[in-house]
Regions:
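Extended, well-ordered alpha-helical scaffold/bundle regions in very large, multi-domain proteins
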Residues: 1-33
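Catalytic alpha/beta core of large soluble enzyme barrels
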Residues: 14, 18, 39-43, 52-59, ...
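Conserved A3 ("GATE") glycine/threonine-rich loop of ANL adenylate-forming enzymes
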Residues: 1, 36, 69
Length: 201
């Protein structure tokens, strides 16, 4: 996606001019995020793209970014972007009241969803996936992590697990973490609500 976004941006730059401040961007100096990816993993001609950027510049300084979409996803009944859903059925309170949301295509994709509270057992695989996406993203991904205190001794998430996840996020290339969400086991039943195969609302 980033490759073709940048390529299209060079085409637009050749037609309409470079974005303001292009000369201050790393792209102007020949840098590409793909430079951090091992050569054997690359399937596109990044050197060609680098040449096009050098020749024409970019019309857009950012071509790919993932916004937090917790609120906007409710309007379109989508999941929250890169994040796993809170449950197959979940409720969120706002000033306008309580909104109950069912994940898209729950009837057919019931067993395909992984909720954030399932990820909570070990956030590292989720962070690994975000680290791969970050390699080609123009802006920092604000990643959340999840923890269920009831699954730990004395109902407390050990500090070493929190630190492990913070350090792991940095190791895989995530510059920012956002929320460290917690939940007790009592809330998990109401958020999933589909164990029998029929979701309760």
């Amino acid at each position: 996606m980033q490759y073709y976004g940048l390529l299209e941006s060079t085409r637009l730059a050749s037609e309409r001019g470079r974005c303001e401040g292009f000369d201050r961007l790393k792209y102007a100096k020949g840098w590409l995020k793909a430079d951090a990816t091992p050569a054997e993993e690359k399937t596109l001609d990044w050197e060609y793209l680098r040449g096009e950027i050098q020749a024409h510049g970019l019309r857009n300084s950012t071509v790919m970014a993932f916004m937090p979409s917790e609120t906007s996803s409710q309007i379109s009944n989508e999941t929250s972007g890169l994040e796993p859903p809170h449950g197959l059925v979940s409720s969120k309170k706002s000033k306008s009241g309580v909104l109950t949301q069912v994940v898209p295509e729950v009837e057919t994709l019931f067993n395909s969803y992984t909720t954030c509270w399932e990820v909570a057992d070990d956030n590292r695989n989720y962070l690994n996936a975000l680290g791969e996406i970050m390699k080609f993203n123009c802006q920092a991904i604000s990643a959340n992590t999840w923890y269920v205190p009831a699954r730990h001794n004395n109902n407390k998430v050990p500090a070493k697990i929190l630190m492990r996840d913070i350090l792991h996020a940095r190791k895989v290339g995530l510059p920012t973490l956002y929320y460290q969400n917690t939940n007790d086991e009592a809330d998990l039943e109401s958020q999933t609500g589909c164990e029998s195969g029929a979701c309760s609302i």
